[in-house]
């Protein structure tokens, strides 16, 4: 066993010498690399002070941040590659001492580097070369967890407990920590971080062969030095938390109670840890503080308060306060300017009066301001804007010539013939004027009765008559232009006598065929049928005019039978020369 131990020491010394030689040749930071290698060599002893000081100077504030980052990278590389617990322990000791005694720039760069790469997470580290190495490897992993938690506590607290300068409180002989002056929310955030750090510290209790190792005791002494300040910071925070406890909400009070209970348990564990460390050689010169337990009666009082504590939290109160401020600001912005001017005038007039009257009139002014608040911009009853008037649509409606021709504003409704003349003179499509605005009749001096002129759906009876009259006139013009104009002279009279609305009176469905001439055979058949009907109706004329059935109608255009098949001469042209002779010569057929 002794031969194997000597071989390992010789092999470790050879590796250190080789690494130093390579650093002298290839490294750009020769002095820093050599100092790191010599401070973390394989010799089972604490790092030499001169090598540690070189590392302190390389990571000082006067050096570039790149040099500090390179130092952290070199230490991380040294820790990740080694499988020897002595080298790993020395690397952690150098990091711990630099955090405690070095410049804050090293702490900041190490925190930034740990976000990208976890330098202190060595949970898989193990040196199983000997039973001593086995026990020491376990303590190395615990020590690394404590240093990692120390960085996390610094991230939460924004300051280092060991580097904190404790001010003296007014009227007190002892110094106080920052936790004694923190608010309730900060205490609920920082005290759990400090308690977690103390938990990692208590876990650094060496076991087995590591208890008597000198290098382990050297590192443990550094941990014990920090335990004093950590406990004092937690104790001051607990005192401050107890003072605020009965003003907290139930949610915050539950958190505070858990912190208070954990502080009592950690005080017991820390007292046991101190008793365990008092037997160490390096801890003989330490003065361990006396730890006191919190009274159980106060713990019961805190539990009773939680049962009756209010539900709303301090955060909710702040949010409600902010919402009230925003609502007040919005109300002030929505208030009109005129009431403000009136208030100023009232204040000017009231300045001459006694103060008692001013106090009595202030509530009245507040009531007036509340009554003068403007209505909301959006009307909830008309979300679709159905009652809004489009200015463009109103302008088109006013400029519509057809609607003005039917219902001119300020005058009574004209006859259908007048509207027909206006339509023929040139108007827009009659489809656009089917529905007219309801306020046209209201402008007339003598409005027409609503029941007599209005149909279902808001349509006007006169409007429909004029539209159908316009349609009949247009069709007659088209038929005349097409060559079917024999009965054109009789059309205006027929139109004037007929009802313009075809749906108002039942008419002949074949009335439109009067302007078209039937075929010859049909005309002869209709002529015979007509003569037979005339003979049956007038027997007196049949006795004296036996040949009257050969006589043509004297004036076919004057007959206006609604059935085209009962009046065959309506479509036949009259002879130009024999018309007058037939009227005065009843026996002209005998010639």
From Swiss-Prot:
Gene3D superfamilies: 1.25.40.90, ANTH domain. Keywords: Coated pit, Cytoplasmic vesicle, Endocytosis, Golgi apparatus, Membrane. Residues 323-345, 355-369 have a biased composition (Acidic residues). It is found in: Membrane, Clathrin-coated pit; Golgi apparatus; Cytoplasmic vesicle, Clathrin-coated vesicle. Residues 24-161 form the ENTH domain. InterPro entries: ANTH_dom (IPR011417), ANTH_dom_sf (IPR014712), ANTH_N_plant (IPR048050), AP180-like (IPR045192), ENTH (IPR013809), ENTH_VHS (IPR008942). Residues 310-381, 536-591 are annotated as: Disordered. It comes from the Eukaryota. GO terms for cellular component: clathrin-coated pit; clathrin-coated vesicle; Golgi apparatus; plastid. Residues 553-564 have a biased composition (Low complexity). One of its GO terms (biological process) is clathrin-dependent endocytosis. GO terms for molecular function: 1-phosphatidylinositol binding; clathrin binding. Residues 577-591 have a biased composition (Polar residues). Pfam families: ANTH. PANTHER family: CLATHRIN ASSEMBLY PROTEIN, PHOSPHATIDYLINOSITOL-BINDING CLATHRIN ASSEMBLY PROTEIN LAP. This is Putative clathrin assembly protein At5g57200. It comes from Arabidopsis thaliana (Mouse-ear cress). The lineage of its organism: Eukaryota, Viridiplantae, Streptophyta, Embryophyta, Tracheophyta.
């Amino acid at each position: 066993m002794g031969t194997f131990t000597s071989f390992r020491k010789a092999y470790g010394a050879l590796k250190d010498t080789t690494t130093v030689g390579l650093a002298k040749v290839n490294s750009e930071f020769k002095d820093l690399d050599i100092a790191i290698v010599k401070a973390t060599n394989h010799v089972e002893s604490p790092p030499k002070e001169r090598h540690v000081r070189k590392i302190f100077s390389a990571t000082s504030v006067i050096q570039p941040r790149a040099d500090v980052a390179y130092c952290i990278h070199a230490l991380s590389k040294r820790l990740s590659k080694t499988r020897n617990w002595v080298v790993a322990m020395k690397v952690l000791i150098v990091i711990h001492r630099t955090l405690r005694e070095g410049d804050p720039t090293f702490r900041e760069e190490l925190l930034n580097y740990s976000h990208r790469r976890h330098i202190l997470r060595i949970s898989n580290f193990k040196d199983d070369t000997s039973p001593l190495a086995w026990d020491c490897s376990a303590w190395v992993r615990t020590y690394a967890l404590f240093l990692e938690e120390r960085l996390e506590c610094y991230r939460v607290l924004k300051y280092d407990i060991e580097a904190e300068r404790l001010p003296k409180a007014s009227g007190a002989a002892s110094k106080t920590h920052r936790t004694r002056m923190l608010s309730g929310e900060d205490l609920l955030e920082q005290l759990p971080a400090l308690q977690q750090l103390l938990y990692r510290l208590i876990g650094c209790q060496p076991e087995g062969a590591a208890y008597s190792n000198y290098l382990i005791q050297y590192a443990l002494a550094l941990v014990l030095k920090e335990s004093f300040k950590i406990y004092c910071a937690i104790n001051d925070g607990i005192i401050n938390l107890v003072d605020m406890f009965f003003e907290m909400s139930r949610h915050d009070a539950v958190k505070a109670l858990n912190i208070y209970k954990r502080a009592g348990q950690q005080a017991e564990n820390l007292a046991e840890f101190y008793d365990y460390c008092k037997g160490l050689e390096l801890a003989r010169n330490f003065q361990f503080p006396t730890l006191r337990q919190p009274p159980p009666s106060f713990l019961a009082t805190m539990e009773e308060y939680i049962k009756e504590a209010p539900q709303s939290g301090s955060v909710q109160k702040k949010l409600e306060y902010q919402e009230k401020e925003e609502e007040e600001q919005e109300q002030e912005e929505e208030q009109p300017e005129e009431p403000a001017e009136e208030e100023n005038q009232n204040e000017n007039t009231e300045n001459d009066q006694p103060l008692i009257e001013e106090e009595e009139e202030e509530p009245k002014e507040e009531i007036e301001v509340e009554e003068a608040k403007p209505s909301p911009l959006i009307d909830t009853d008309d979300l679709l804007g159905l009652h809004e008037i489009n200015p463009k649509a109103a302008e088109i409606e006013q400029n519509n010539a057809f609607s003005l021709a039917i219902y001119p504003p300020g005058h009574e409704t004209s006859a259908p013939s007048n509207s027909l003349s206006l339509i023929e003179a040139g108007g827009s499509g009659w489809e656009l004027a089917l529905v007219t605005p309801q306020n046209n009749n209201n402008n007339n001096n003598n409005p027409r009765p609503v029941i007599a002129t209005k149909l279902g759906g808001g349509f006007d009876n006169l409007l429909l008559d004029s539209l159908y009259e316009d349609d009949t006139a247009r069709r007659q013009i088209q038929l005349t232009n097409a060559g079917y104009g024999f009965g054109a002279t009789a059309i205006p009279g027929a139109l004037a006598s007929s009802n313009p609305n075809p749906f108002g009176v039942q008419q002949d469905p074949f009335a439109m065929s009067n302007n078209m001439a039937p075929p010859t055979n049909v005309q002869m058949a209709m002529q015979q049928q007509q003569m037979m009907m005339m003979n049956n109706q007038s027997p007196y004329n049949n006795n004296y005019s036996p040949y009257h059935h050969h006589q043509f109608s004297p004036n076919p255009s004057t007959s206006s039978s609604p059935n085209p098949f009962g009046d065959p001469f309506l479509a036949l042209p009259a002879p130009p020369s024999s018309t007058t002779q037939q009227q005065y010569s009843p026996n002209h057929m005998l010639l």
